[in-house]
């Protein structure tokens, strides 16, 4: 490209007197071309929006004939105007505030976005929205019906093949081709021309097979709503609604006394809640405002929640969280076929870049929201495991860091499942070492781009089951003048470090605890981690480690080199964001075996300080291999920083004893190599054999262990 530019400049110089004239024409032509492209893109966007509106109008005309189960939208506050959709699904007007609304005010004006299907509406329009959300519980139905809807959300998760009509195989959404507006199914994500729908429904009906993700989607025909449909259920609903409305009235009155109430033409907006019983019976919480007053209403937003501190356009209101928790408690699973293998999803909203809410919405659109759970201080993995307590075969996807994975594995182990569910990982943390080893990627970027999340879910469906060793760490602290003798216990699945690496992790952890809002990016987190490492290069606080720490492996004392500032005990082949410390692929002059995450053996290496860690990161050095063994004891004579799977703490004088605890089932993405496909196929064969009673759960576990050893 630069060569072309230099050639053009030389040609203009050689043109002599005509060069200014030629240059002017080139500039004019470039500006004109950009104007044409801009106009075309704007026209294309307007045309697409008109098609969506046309599809919405067509759906309203035939909605009663579609015979789809009705369901209310699950509205949450959303401040992300830059994200799709940009049009209100009720009034069909833009969701972006007008020019006469200040930028500061527009940031605090929420829209309502459905957490289930992704449509959005003005906060004053949402109460009038049609009950056309996908029904997540349809127990008693013979089959799932297509839930056709206008395509408000531009789903990047749709593969290229879904850009064609499900019935006629003609392209959808291309303005130059004569075609009708399109609908898309909220379950299988297929597209169909509106004009083709009537023909298809007459010929083959409207049964939906859930599309390419049918094996991981929890079918709504097997989900039952627990709340009674009788008087008790109605009274409970009315009671909850009345409590919510009374709280709304009290907040309005309080704001009115302080002069901060939201107003419209000088009047407080309390008329919508003046008669709570009437409001509940009519199913309305806020009356629909007239369109000619919308801008006035948007200007008076002093009582609306502030957008500062919210992540990914998702509101952080407690009422949204409590509503989500109540929503998940309503359901149970019934009549699942014996070979059903639904995917149970756990999302840690605070992991890594705090992308959990955005990912939660995307997964709700692709899967059944009943099978997606958000982990936090109010809800742990038990809620999801309770839902699947009677499901013999299911799989688990953990969206979070290594700490979140350990949390879920602990909860699974406590359940004592006859066939424990294997676990896949969608990495949201900073290091994501276990995710790297299992081939699931190094960060959230693995599901960015066209069709990536859909492809990721399909990879889970075809993943191979492998084993992962879990280790028990017994922490003993000797009694001192300041501290009495104590004994603790933790689990380890990745690595344990003591010395310089743990000190860096400890300082990083303390900073994140003090100011968590500054740690919202994986890239920034790594920069801060590097900053702490650079500081330790100068401090060398762990230079006396060889004299304060001694190592015992399988009952034998192991000498620690005098220049060591850190010891690292490894269970997997990835450390600190992808560093291979044991280096199986290199030749070594020792007699140690290769490293494996399910051989019930640990590896021990040492590092020479933070500078050495930095060189390891970029592949300019190697860690020194010290030992392999099944029982590791680390004796400490003075306080030293320790980290277990990234969780740092200060170890007082005492002993760390690491012993094998057990093995857990993990899902490993099938590689392109023949062995990877063979492992995935063998998993299917073993599961089918167990379903048919040929083998039992314990026999399957033994065979999986042997297969993991030979095919990994």
Curated annotation (Swiss-Prot):
GO molecular function: ATP binding; ATP-dependent diacylglycerol kinase activity; zinc ion binding
SMART domains given in the database record: C1, DAGKa, DAGKc
CDD domains: C1, C1_DGK_rpt2
Keyword Zinc-finger listed: yes
GO CC list: endoplasmic reticulum
Catalytic activity: a 1,2-diacyl-sn-glycerol + ATP = a 1,2-diacyl-sn-glycero-3-phosphate + ADP + H(+); 1-octadecanoyl-2-(5Z,8Z,11Z,14Z-eicosatetraenoyl)-sn-glycerol + ATP = 1-octadecanoyl-2-(5Z,8Z,11Z,14Z-eicosatetraenoyl)-sn-glycero-3-phosphate + ADP + H(+); 1,2-di-(9Z-octadecenoyl)-sn-glycerol + ATP = 1,2-di-(9Z-octadecenoyl)-sn-glycero-3-phosphate + ADP + H(+)
Subcellular locations according to the entry: Endoplasmic reticulum
Induction: Induced by cold stress. Induced by wounding.
Gene Ontology biological process terms in this record: defense response; leaf development; phospholipase C-activating G protein-coupled receptor signaling pathway; response to cold; response to wounding; root development
Keyword tags: ATP-binding, Endoplasmic reticulum, Kinase, Metal-binding, Nucleotide-binding, Plant defense, Repeat, Stress response, Transferase, Zinc, Zinc-finger
Pfam families in UniProt: C1_1, DAGK_acc, DAGK_cat
Residue ranges of every copy of the DAGKc domain listed in the record: 338-479
Predominant subcellular localization, coarse grouping: endoplasmic reticulum
Tissues in which the protein is found: Expressed in rosette and cauline leaves, flowers, siliques and roots. Highly expressed in young leaves and at lower levels in older leaves. In young seedlings, expressed at the root-shoot junction zone and vascular bundles of the cotyledons. In older plants, expressed in root tip, central cylinder, root hair, leaf mesophyll cells and guard cells, sepals, filaments of the anthers, stigma, valves of young and early adult siliques and hilum of seeds.
Domain of life: Eukaryota
Phenotype reported upon loss of the gene: No visible phenotype under normal growth conditions, but the double mutants dgk2 and dgk4 exhibit defective pollen growth and seed development because of non-viable male gametophyte.
EC code: 2.7.1.107
Summary of the function given for this chain in its UniProt record: Phosphorylates the second messenger diacylglycerol (DAG) to generate phosphatidic acid (PA), another important signaling molecule. PA is required for plant development and responses to abiotic stress and pathogen attack. May be involved in the accumulation of PA during cold stress. Involved in response to freezing stress by modulating the accumulation of PA. Exhibits high specificity for the unsaturated DAG analogs 1-stearoyl-2-arachidonoyl-sn-glycerol (1,2-SAG) and 1,2-dioleoyl-sn-glycerol (1,2-DOG).
Family: Belongs to the eukaryotic diacylglycerol kinase family.
Subunit: Monomer.
Protein name as catalogued: Diacylglycerol kinase 2
Source lineage: Eukaryota, Viridiplantae, Streptophyta, Embryophyta, Tracheophyta
């Amino acid at each position: 490209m630069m060569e072309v530019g230099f050639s053009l400049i030389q040609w203009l110089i050689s043109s002599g007197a005509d060069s200014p004239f030629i240059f002017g024409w080139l500039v004019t032509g470039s500006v004109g071309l950009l104007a044409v492209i801009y106009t075309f893109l704007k026209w294309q966007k307007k045309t697409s929006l008109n098609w969506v509106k046309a599809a919405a109008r067509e759906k309203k005309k035939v909605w009663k004939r579609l015979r789809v189960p009705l369901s209310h939208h699950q509205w949450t506050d959303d401040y992300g105007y830059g994200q799709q959709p940009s049009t209100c699904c009720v009034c069909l007007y833009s969701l972006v505030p007008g020019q006469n609304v200040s930028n500061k005010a527009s940031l605090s004006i929420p829209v309502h976005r459905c957490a289930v299907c992704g449509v959005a509406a003005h906060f004053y329009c949402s109460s009038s929205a049609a009950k056309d959300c996908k029904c997540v519980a349809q127990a008693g139905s013979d089959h799932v019906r297509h839930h056709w809807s206008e395509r408000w959300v531009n789903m990047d998760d749709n593969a290229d093949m879904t850009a064609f009509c499900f019935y006629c195989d003609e392209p959808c959404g291309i303005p130059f081709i004569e075609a009708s507006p399109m609908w898309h199914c909220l379950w299988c994500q297929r597209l169909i021309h509106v004009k083709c729908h009537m023909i298809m429904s007459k010929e083959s009906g409207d049964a939906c097979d859930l599309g390419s993700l049918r094996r991981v989607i929890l079918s709504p025909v097997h989900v039952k709503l627990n709340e009674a449909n009788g008087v008790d259920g109605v009274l409970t609903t009315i009671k909850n609604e009345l409590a919510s409305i009374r709280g709304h009235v009290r907040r309005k009155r309080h704001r009115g006394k302080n002069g901060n109430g939201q107003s419209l033409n000088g009047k407080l907006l309390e008329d919508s809640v003046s008669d709570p019983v009437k409001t509940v019976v009519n199913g309305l919480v806020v009356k629909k405002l007239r369109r000619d007053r919308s801008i006035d209403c948007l200007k008076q937003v002093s009582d609306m929640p502030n957008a500062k501190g919210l992540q990914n356009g998702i509101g952080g209101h407690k009422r949204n969280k409590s509503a989500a928790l109540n929503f998940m408690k309503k359901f149970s699973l019934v009549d699942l076929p014996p070979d059903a293998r639904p995917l149970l999803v756990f999302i840690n909203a605070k992991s890594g870049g705090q992308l959990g809410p955005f990912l939660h919405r995307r997964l709700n659109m692709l899967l059944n929201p009943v099978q997606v759970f958000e982990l936090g201080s109010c809800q742990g993995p038990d809620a999801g495991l309770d839902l699947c307590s009677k499901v013999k075969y299911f799989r688990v996807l953990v969206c979070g860091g290594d700490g979140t994975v350990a949390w879920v594995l602990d909860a699974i182990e406590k359940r004592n499942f006859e066939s424990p569910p294997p676990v896949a990982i969608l990495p949201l943390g900073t290091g994501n070492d276990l995710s790297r080893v299992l081939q699931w990627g190094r960060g959230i970027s693995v599901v960015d781009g066209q069709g990536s999340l859909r492809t990721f879910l399909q990879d889970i469906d075809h993943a191979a089951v492998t084993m992962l060793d879990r280790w028990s760490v017994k922490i003993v602290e000797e009694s001192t003048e300041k501290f009495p003798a104590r004994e603790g216990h933790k689990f380890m699945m990745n690595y344990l470090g003591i010395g310089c690496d743990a000190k860096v992790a400890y300082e990083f952890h303390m900073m994140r605890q003090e100011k968590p809002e500054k740690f919202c990016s994986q890239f920034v987190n790594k920069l801060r981690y590097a900053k702490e490492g650079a500081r330790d290069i100068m401090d060398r606080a762990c230079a006396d480690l060889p004299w304060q720490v001694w190592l015992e492996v399988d009952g034998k004392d192991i000498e620690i080199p005098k220049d060591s500032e850190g010891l690292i005990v490894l269970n997997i082949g990835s450390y600190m964001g992808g560093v291979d410390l044991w280096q199986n692929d290199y030749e070594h002059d020792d007699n140690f075996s290769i490293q494996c995450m399910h051989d019930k053996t640990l590896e021990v290496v040492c590092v020479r300080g933070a500078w050495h860690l930095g060189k390891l990161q970029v592949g300019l050095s190697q860690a020194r291999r010290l030992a392999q063994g099944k029982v590791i004891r680390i004796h400490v004579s003075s306080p030293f920083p320790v980290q277990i799977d990234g969780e740092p703490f200060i170890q007082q004088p005492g002993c760390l004893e690491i012993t094998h605890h057990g093995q857990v089932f993990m899902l490993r993405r099938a590689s392109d190599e023949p062995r990877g496909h063979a492992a995935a196929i063998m998993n299917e064969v073993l599961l089918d054999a167990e379903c048919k009673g040929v083998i039992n759960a314990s026999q399957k576990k033994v065979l999986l262990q042997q297969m993991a050893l030979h095919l990994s």
